[in-house]
């Protein structure tokens, strides 16, 4: 079976994020980027399936000016991917609709049985790329996937989908399909930095134009850092005293007026 993994670079939250001069987005000029956590789970799941059943794993990532997609793709090779492809050339990070169109265009030139991607990314949290790719290609899809098992005949997969309250749904999905992964069975495998650097110099990173999309039509008018409150009240005393003070604060704000005091 042939697996394709769609990956994205996102801001590294270990560093301080700053708003750009226009006040409509993050300042990406000096920002550090890392692979989206959920995309790493998708890659690990694809590698586990490939290792168990054979086949190939191809990784696709969008070529965005800010960031280092070559390092991302070299990391994929270090972890065990068979082929890596940089899709398109974007001056700025594309929205979900544009990204999905680019990926869909590239997938039209590849053979695949299963397309995997992360359920969402930290810089948008909308979870749209996977479903949009599936829609563009006319494929079935399942999101929030926590388990994947390929049937013996290789024409379907059984997947588990996570719901609120610890409920898990089980679905049988006809291949080819798109799955948006919430977590993998094992932690993403380690990629030594020295090996990544070596592959960045020697590995073949293919390039594809990708599909052209009109975008979502959404415009960010303003982005601000959340305001921090100036005061906080520390409540000390016995449980009875603390409970009475909490009830009083709620009553002052018109919340829970029926709470016994």
Region locations from a protein language model:
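N-terminal glycine-rich FAD/FM-binding segment characteristic of electron-transfer flavoproteins
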Residues: 1-261
């Amino acid at each position: 079976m042939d697996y394709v993994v769609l990956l994205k670079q996102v801001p590294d939250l270990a560093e301080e994020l700053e708003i750009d001069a226009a006040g409509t987005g993050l300042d990406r000029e000096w920002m550090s980027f890392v692979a989206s956590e959920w995309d790493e789970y998708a890659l690990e799941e694809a590698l586990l399936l490939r290792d168990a059943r054979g086949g190939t794993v191809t990784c696709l990532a969008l070529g965005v000016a800010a960031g280092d997609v070559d390092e991302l793709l070299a990391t994929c090779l270090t972890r065990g991917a068979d082929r890596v492809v940089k899709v398109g050339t974007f001056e700025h990070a594309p929205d979900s609709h544009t990204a999905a169109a680019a990926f869909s265009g590239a997938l039209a030139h590849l053979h695949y049985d299963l397309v995997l991607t992360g359920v969402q990314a930290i810089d948008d949290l909308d979870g749209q790329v996977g479903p949009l790719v599936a829609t563009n290609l006319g494929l079935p899809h399942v999101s929030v996937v926590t388990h994947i098992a390929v049937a013996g005949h290789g024409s379907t997969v059984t997947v588990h989908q996570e719901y609120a309250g610890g409920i898990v749904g089980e679905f049988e999905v006809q291949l080819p399909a798109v799955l948006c992964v919430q977590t993998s069975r094992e932690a993403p495998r380690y990629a030594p930095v020295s090996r990544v650097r070596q592959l960045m110099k020697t590995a073949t990173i293919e390039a594809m134009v990708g599909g052209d999309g009109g975008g979502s039509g959404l415009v960010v008018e303003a982005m601000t850092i959340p305001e921090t409150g100036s005061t906080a009240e520390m409540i000390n005393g016995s449980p009875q005293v603390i409970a009475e003070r909490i009830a009083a604060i709620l009553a002052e704000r018109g919340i829970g007026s029926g709470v016994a005091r």
